């Protein structure tokens, strides 16, 4: 069963979540650059003349991807969900309000959780937390 957060619980996890997401956001551009370089190199590579850099790039892409997966796993282990694109710094915390499932929505750089959205609403459906009444504020 998935963990659900009260607003206070989610806010208490933010110092740790923030550190993890900061690391994730910092590594993501390096991974994208490596993937783009790999794709460029392999698209122009001839079968009869393999480029020795391809194998090295594959190892680098894999290593950085594992690092990023580790950060995502850490966020997931806490009960939250890192959102795509990964460099957005968005994290959703499953919650319940008035008997319905919602997400408490946080973005890297925000000091506390100030937004929420319906489960199917996504970032575009973000609304101010002030619009909801939470007993645990």
Where are these regions (language model features)?
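Alpha-helix boundary/capping detector
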Residues: 36-37, 43, 50, 101, ...
